[in-house]
């Protein structure tokens, strides 16, 4: 089992110090958010809270994920970084491939790409993209980015992504994993079909056996059941070593936790409680060290 955490709602000035601490104490990965902007009003409910509300302050600072990752990569040696998730359907894949390859060069390939579908119609409308095409657009973008990262001249001709032979340099020295996020069947199917793994939203531990079975079924459907596949799970109520070992036995490869969160919180209330805590940088660093000493050490 590998361990990581997400830096959503963490002040930008704390990122490097937190990354250095996690790197020193044996964490595997850090995830960062992607949010180009937050509309004051949205026309659809947020899909991951019971009442559809957005749980974060709209003026919360969110760095561009590639900037945040680069800032942390230059002060660390080992830990990996993952945008989770990059809203790929609203982004231009040639430019995203360039950003990813550039960050990979700076980070010595300690980066993966986590992608997902943006959920706000306003994002698509104001960026001039037809939201109805987002699934197919993302499929093509994933395939095009994979090609571009291979090096040499590449071309791609899809309905939404279309370019003649181009070359991009530098390119990564090793394969950069692409993880697909989302809780819906189409998202999980996309992960099984095109991804090197799946990124979860927040789930409780009693949901996990059915989720893993569903992912494995889709992988068999696409003939990929024998390929390596990471499952990166965010499960706040997996609080004990025994809980985590049971998840590992189910096939979970990576557990995303919030080490400074309140132990035992339910998934649906976790984020709100974390916000109420407003932990200091020192509290976060102490929690990162404590979790590494008491939990991660059991899996080395």
Positions of the model-derived regions?
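Active-site-adjacent structural elements that line small-molecule/cofactor binding pockets in enzymes
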Residues: 1-300
């Amino acid at each position: 089992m590998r361990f990581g955490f997400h830096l959503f709602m963490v002040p930008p000035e704390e990122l490097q110090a937190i990354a250095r601490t996690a790197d020193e104490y044996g964490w595997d990965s850090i995830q960062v958010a992607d949010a180009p902007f937050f509309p004051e009003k949205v026309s659809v409910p947020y899909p991951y809270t019971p009442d559809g509300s957005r749980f974060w302050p709209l003026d919360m600072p969110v760095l561009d994920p590639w900037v945040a990752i680069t800032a942390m990569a230059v002060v660390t040696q080992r830990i990996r970084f993952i945008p989770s998730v990059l809203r790929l359907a609203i982004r231009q894949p040639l430019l995203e491939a360039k950003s990813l390859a550039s960050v990979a060069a700076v980070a010595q390939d300690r980066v993966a790409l986590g992608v997902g579908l943006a959920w706000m119609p306003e994002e698509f409308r104001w960026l001039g993209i037809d939201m109805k095409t987002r699934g197919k657009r993302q499929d093509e973008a994933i395939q095009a980015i994979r090609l571009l990262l291979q090096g040499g001249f590449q071309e791609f001709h899809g309905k939404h992504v279309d370019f003649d032979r181009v070359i991009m340099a530098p390119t990564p020295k090793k394969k950069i994993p692409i993880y697909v996020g989302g809780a819906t069947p189409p998202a999980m199917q996309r992960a099984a079909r095109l991804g090197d793994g799946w990124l979860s939203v927040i789930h409780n531990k009693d949901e996990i056996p059915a989720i893993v079975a569903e992912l494995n079924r889709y992988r068999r459907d696409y003939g990929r059941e024998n390929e390596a596949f990471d499952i990166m799970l965010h499960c706040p109520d997996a609080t004990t070593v025994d809980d985590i070992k049971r998840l590992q036995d189910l096939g979970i490869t990576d557990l995303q936790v919030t080490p400074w969160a309140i132990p035992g919180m339910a998934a649906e209330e976790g984020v709100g409680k974390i916000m109420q805590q407003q932990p200091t940088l020192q509290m976060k660093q102490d929690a990162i060290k404590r979790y590494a000493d008491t939990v991660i050490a059991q899996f080395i």
